[in-house]
Amino acid sequence: MITRRDLLKTTALGFASLGLPAWRREEKIRLGVASYSLRNLKRPQAIEAVKACGVTYVNIKSVHLDYKLSPEELAAGRKEFDDAGLKVVGSGNNSLNSEKDIAMVFEYAKNARFPLLVIAPKPDLLPQIEEAVKKSGIPVAIHNHGPEDKLFPAPSDALKLIKNMDPRVGLCVDVGHTTRAGKDVVQEIADAGPRVLDMHIKDLKDLMKKDTQVPVGDGKMPVAEIFKQLVKQNYAGYVNLEYEIEANDPVPGMKKSFDFMRKVAGEVAK
């Protein structure tokens, strides 16, 4: 039996979806910006650039909220993002090479109200990082950096070390670095399952070469297959564009990337 409450709920959902594209209506793929993409822009200009891309989610690099800021300055800087209507979904990448780094970065995250930390840690510090996660309640996502990274070239290199840790110790899958490490990126995501807490997306004309990055959709990255796998495993995190090229004028290429990804996300959401 359909109750009046059920009918009202269904009607409200129907009206809410009118006029919205499928990717936005379902938002099974939540697209955002890794602010490293905007590293040559000051904070106010970076905020405007994110808005120009038509997205609301942003992962903040320390270039836009410096580690050295006081708690009050961090709060004020964070408020600039909030006041612009942006949702801050994390911070990173953050290098954790010592116990001092761990203490500093988690305090930084607390003061800036970051809900997640993308990290590049030393493996022998993982137990201390896990304890910091438990104490603070702030999840961490280990970022892989491809063949140049002797510690975590691919997500699977980190996964084997954290598989028995607190579930809030997870991975930030960088799809470009993953393919350059010679891995099947879709399989890496599937194997990691719920440990995937964050993602950096980019595209490459040659999936093995770092210097071939192009706007997403212009290369060979299997974006549709990646999105389908994320939906299949009920990924609840964000897909943040890390646009590492054209640093002095990144917005046109970023817009082109988002246009493509929205179309793909819309198909996946059907």
Residue ranges and their predicted role:
Residues 21-41, 45-49:
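C-terminal segment of N-terminal export signals and the immediately downstream linker at the start
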Residues 59-76:
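Glycine-rich, proline-tolerant flexible connector loops at the mouths of alpha/beta enzymes
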Residues 1-15:
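N-terminal secretory signal peptides and thylakoid transit peptides that target proteins
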